[in-house]
Amino acid sequence: MLYLSEVLLQHHDIETFEQLLEVVQTRAQSEMFFKIDVKPTYPDTPANWEDRLEGAFVGIHSVTR
């Protein structure tokens, strides 16, 4: 299972929400489940951040854009 908190700890060089989406998409290739256990604190984090992260994980591009 991929935890968002783990992604944020392991990739502390991420500076934007868009970069986070890219990392989640990459990590999704080797994981089956995704747990959103924290809220990202990037200035560009959108109101629908949970939907966009879930979309990035499952590959639904209409949600990630």
Segments from the language model and where they lie:
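Metal-dependent phosphodiesterase/phospholipase catalytic core, i.e.
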Residues: 1-65
